[in-house]
């Protein structure tokens, strides 16, 4: 029933106006799945290789389609993803491109679910599926690689951890985003938006902390449940090998100073989440920070782990971080992402399923977050390619009751 009979690929636009890969998978019984690959702006050194979309599509047509069609079953995700690895023949998808691989992997999952008449989260969930739903982390102020001439810290994230349900959490983040805009207007500070829809005012990091803290407090008072905030520091983008430190404009922080700075911000603002606070190669720095504040907050590895089982195991052995960001396109397939999630769970690491800065209307990650019982999902606050996932999360929560 789920034997794959056709795989088609095309270029479509992502949210930044750049081309990306979209895949369609059709099965013998008429099951159909469509998915599109996202793309990051701040990418980890160890991510799977993203090829030019036209090159990725041509390579996938030559190498992947013949291995899948009339041979592999969409209902068996591991079989699909093993075929993708075999077709590529490298350890980082440099032959067919992680962008073509992840699009096909996700499209096959949808086709398999379609045959069963089940939502994707049920098809993927298996033993992972719990009773809870992920808390959305909403990007409300941004800078770094997502918005030039703004904050050095890449993302300030609203976290409605006290929301009674998914819907209220989603709307709480939207309210914080709106309140940030109101406060900026009151203070006479102009602000455009960055890649992910967050406000990108020309203010210092210190001013941004105060701004987001005020906005979160105001909305928390209005809604009556706990809202905190967190950060994606994207510190690999701040770290300069030539100077051996983290560059904040005219200031350079050593690793020791960076750890101290992050610990102070966690204490001062009761941060619930800090992603990539140190360079992607600094397991020791992550371990030092985790030992110091890991009982107070989530220290999350994105560029540190790149959804890789091998890099996560290195982190586990070093006691570096206590949570992992999951981005399927970083590693190339849903199976690889599942394996990282399973290893994280075995060792008590929280999982955070995430979008990329260059996104499409694809909603697979909403299903992945629910299927794997992730603690958080990071997929923006506003803009259509972000709200597509958030609205799908609301629908899933309603369907699963």
UniProtKB/Swiss-Prot annotation:
Origin: domain of life: Archaea
Pathway terms, separated by semicolons: Carbohydrate degradation; glycolysis; pyruvate from D-glyceraldehyde 3-phosphate: step 4/5
Annotated EC: 4.2.1.11
Residues that bind Mg(2+): 232, 275, 302
Catalytic residues (UniProt): 196 (proton donor), 327 (proton acceptor)
Family membership noted in the UniProt record: Belongs to the enolase family.
Protein name: Enolase
Organism of this sequence: Haloquadratum walsbyi (strain DSM 16790 / HBSQ001)
Gene (name only): eno
């Amino acid at each position: 029933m789920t034997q794959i009979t056709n795989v088609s690929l095309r270029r479509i636009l992502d949210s930044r106006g750049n081309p990306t890969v979209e895949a369609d998978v059709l099965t013998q019984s008429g099951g159909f799945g469509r998915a599109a690959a996202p793309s990051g702006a701040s990418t980890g050194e160890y991510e799977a290789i993203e090829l030019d979309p036209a090159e990725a599509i041509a390579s996938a047509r030559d190498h992947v389609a013949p291995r899948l069609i009339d041979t592999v079953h969409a209902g068996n995700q591991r079989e699909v993803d093993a075929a993708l690895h075999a077709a590529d023949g490298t350890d980082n998808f440099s032959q067919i491109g992680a962008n073509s691989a992840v699009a096909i992997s996700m499209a096959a999952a949808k086709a398999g679910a379609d045959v069963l008449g089940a939502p994707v989260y049920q098809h993927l969930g298996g033993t992972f599926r719990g009773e809870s739903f992920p808390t959305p982390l909403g990007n409300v102020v941004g800078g770094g690689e997502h918005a030039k001439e703004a904050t050095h810290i890449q993302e300030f994230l609203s976290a409605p951890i006290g929301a009674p349900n998914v819907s209220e959490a989603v709307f709480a983040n939207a309210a914080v985003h709106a309140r940030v805009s109101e406060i900026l207007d009151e203070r006479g500070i102009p602000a455009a938006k960055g890649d992910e829809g967050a406000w990108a005012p020309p203010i210092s990091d210190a001013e941004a902390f105060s701004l987001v803290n005020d906005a979160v407090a105001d909305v928390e008072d209005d809604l009556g449940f706990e809202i905190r905030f967190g950060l994606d520091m994207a510190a690999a983008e701040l770290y300069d090998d030539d100077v051996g430190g983290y560059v904040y404009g005219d200031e350079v922080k050593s690793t020791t100073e960076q750890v101290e700075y992050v610990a102070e911000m966690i204490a001062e603002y009761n941060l619930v989440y800090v992603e990539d606070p140190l360079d992607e190669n600094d397991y020791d720095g992550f371990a030092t920070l985790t030992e110091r504040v890991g009982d107070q907050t989530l220290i999350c590895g994105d560029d540190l782990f790149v959804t890789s089982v091998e890099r996560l195991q290195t982190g586990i052995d070093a006691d570096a971080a206590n949570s992992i960001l999951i981005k399927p396109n970083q590693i190339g397939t849903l199976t690889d992402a599942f394996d990282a999630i399973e290893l994280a769970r075995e060792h008590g690491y929280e999982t955070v399923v995430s979008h990329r800065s260059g996104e499409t209307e694809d909603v697979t990650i909403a299903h992945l977050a629910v299927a794997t019982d992730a603690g958080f999902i990071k997929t923006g606050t506003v803009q259509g390619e972000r709200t597509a996932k958030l609205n799908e999360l609301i629908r899933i929560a309603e369907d699963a009751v």
